[in-house]
Amino acid sequence: QLLSKEHLVEAVNKLGLNRRGVVTARRVARYADGLSESGGESKARALMIERGWQTLELQIELFDPVEPGRPYRVDYLWRVGDRLIIGEFDGFVKSEKAAEEGKLAKAQFDERQRESRLSLLDNCKIVRLCWDDLRDPTKLDRKLKVAGVPRAC
């Protein structure tokens, strides 16, 4: 880790109020988190924050209900009462790499099995996000609303 969140917030706060962009920098620093695994995940999270969706947990391990010792890490997780809403961002990097290695069909099969297992968790819903949703944030809003993600208070 190059810089802790606390040090980033401290550095931005030292800039003073009269510097151009300091308000935006403070907001960004407040939400900084190194857990996102791709630019798409980070951009989606930024849009969710900007558009007023409830904050979420990043890169959370959930366990396979069929094989309880088997963990699956999810991109986003919202806990809403006794329900879990899992968010997954689908970029192209993993698919492209699998295709280059001649393993695309296996990767797609494994992903379907993973999603099938996660969907068996009690009171669980899965929402898949993609670059299209980021280019048209109203699509992102509709998906999150239908999935049951609450707005921030």
What are these regions (language model features)?
Residues 1-153:
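Surface segments flanking catalytic/ligand-binding clefts of nucleic-acid enzymes
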